[in-house]
Amino acid sequence: MKRVLLVGAGHAHAVLLASLAQSPLYGARLMLVSPYPRQIYSAMLPGLIAGHYRREEAEFDVAALAARAYAEFVPARVRSLDAAVRGVTLEDGRELEYDVLCLNAGSTPQDDVPGAREHALAVKPFERLVESLFGSHIAIAGAGAGGAELAMALRHRGCEVTLYSEQPAFAGALGLRVERALRRRRIDFRPGMRVDAVEPGPVVIAGRARQQFDRVLWATGPAALPWLATSGVAVDEHGFVRVDETLRSVSHPEVFALGDCASTGEAKSGVHAVRQGELLAGNLRKLIAGTPLEPYERQSRALLLLTCGARYAIAARGGWTAEGRWAWWWKNWIDRRWMARLREQKKSAVG
């Protein structure tokens, strides 16, 4: 009986657990470690903030999903990983051993700017963000898809929003549509302006300008979780786990890495993580059975649906872009279908 340890309840592991709830993984003892028994689905976070969804519509029960997949749920954070001895240490001091380790623990916003960690509110974890989000004048550092969607969701809620973007997050027609959407909603968009520091207040320092806000949200690009660097698992220059074509660690084949914490060559997106989770569901069965694993087919032209506060969205794939209310309803259908899958009761039982 192989001990399979799942760290994190991101998109990939959610898909994996939903699959195992329908068809159990025989020959394995599963354990899931994640800090939150209930988790907000990231794609529905802007809609939750904008008021289009209730909290219960935008979150799923991690503990219940694990139970349906016959996995033991451990509500805890990871302190360290020692790949040499195949052990994970939790923040409360407990130690867990594994035969197979699957990492889908996400990332953290880059917070190397002075004062960002102390005086700004990181976008992740979403649960803490939603519980701590208040104020009428909010600054957001980072104008990627997450930052832009948050800015427009908060503006829809009536907040004054200033959005700082050091570098263009989108190119071409998509970039023009996003910037136009921000301007139309009277968001104070400041492209090419880096946040140099955050001081108590909170006060944002950008160049020679100093401005006080009720809240500063930190939505910059993803940074690797610190404990990966000391794990012994091979990582890339940014600290993300290097994986082969089957999403296994190049240094430790008993370790899988998926989603934000993996270095796959793709953009760090939930769309890709979902596909990785579907592959993992099949490859864990193959690993237990001792048969060759399937390779992951990377996707260069994933669909992007970016919400704009109201029930309106921008759609893009490759060089094609469009926008309208229809795009929001399309995204709403996709997201609700996803949540329904995570809540679906199992159709099979262990005999």
Predicted regions: what is each one?
Residues 3-4, 68-137, 217:
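FAD-binding core/adjacent interface of flavoenzyme oxidoreductases
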Residues 1-71, 149-173:
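Beta1-alpha1 glycine-rich phosphate/pyrophosphate-binding loop at the start
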Residues 116-136, 202, 210-275, 282:
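FAD-site-proximal beta/loop scaffold in flavoenzymes
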Residues 310-351:
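C-terminal auxiliary extensions adjacent to catalytic cores
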Residues 73-81, 88, 96, 158-245:
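A Rossmann-like FAD-binding core segment of flavoenzymes
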Residues 128-164:
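Rossmann-like NAD(P)H-binding beta-loop-alpha module
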Residues 7-9, 103, 141-142:
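Conserved N-terminal Rossmann-fold NAD(P)-binding element of oxidoreductases
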Residues 261-309:
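A conserved FAD-binding loop/helix module that cradles the flavin
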